[in-house]
Amino acid sequence: MKEEIAATVVFLTMLVKKHKQLSKQKIEKFAAKLTTILFAKYKNHWYAENPMKGQAFRCIRINTYQAIDAVFEKACAESNVDFNDLGLPKEMTIWVDPFEVCCRYGEKNDPFTIASFKGKDGYNAPKRISHAVEKATSDYYSGTSSDEELTNKEPKTIPKVSNPNSIYQCADYSQAIPSWSQYPRRKNYQNNGYPPNPPMPYYPQQKAYKAFRQSSAFSGPRVDRYHWVNMKRSAIS
């Protein structure tokens, strides 16, 4: 843990020196306070047999949309240093794990190794840290900030054409395209915003059937409801 924390502090200190805003005494005091704070934070969350365990807890992160990491906030307060004077990037992530310290600039770049203590790699730690600082501050690894992606790009306009035979000289193309605000807006409907139901189709009223009329051939008095008497036939007989 001692080597990994030392590599982290040296890496951050070299970045602060490149910014040239703090004196040598303030940088050394900040580095000493940061080392003490990291030791106190990692002592119960360091698992050499499983380096991935506790990685999120040991991660040091700087992001535009997040508050200052508690590690930097405490180190700056105890060393009487303004965080903005450190000159650290707007977005940076450092993973302090057993046997390896990695860093990533921006949100889309690939992480790179600051120092590795696996086997013989530990002997080249100072040289590797210096190389990591140069690599991190280069133009390629400066990273794209997440807030830069939110900026609106101005729309490109068609350049003016001096050729009189160009199609862009026609009246149809030279006129500006009307904005959408000139068109009438969609009507607002009542009833919770839904359009009214369409009218029901009109069906003509059907002609009623006529009631059944008894034929004149069966006219006459009725004996009962099943028999009728024909008066003409009874008179002949």
Swiss-Prot record:
CC per GO annotation: cytoplasm; nucleus
Protein origin, superkingdom: Eukaryota
PROSITE patterns: BTG_1 (PS00960), BTG_2 (PS01203)
Database matches in Gene3D superfamilies: Anti-proliferative protein, N-terminal domain
InterPro entries: Anti_prolifrtn, BTG, BTG-like_sf
Pfam families listed in its UniProt record: BTG (PF07742)
PANTHER family reported for this sequence: B-CELL TRANSLOCATION GENE (PTHR22978), PROTEIN BTG4 (PTHR22978:SF5)
Family affiliation: Belongs to the BTG family.
Protein name, entry field: Maternal B9.10 protein
Taxon lineage: Eukaryota, Metazoa, Chordata, Craniata, Vertebrata
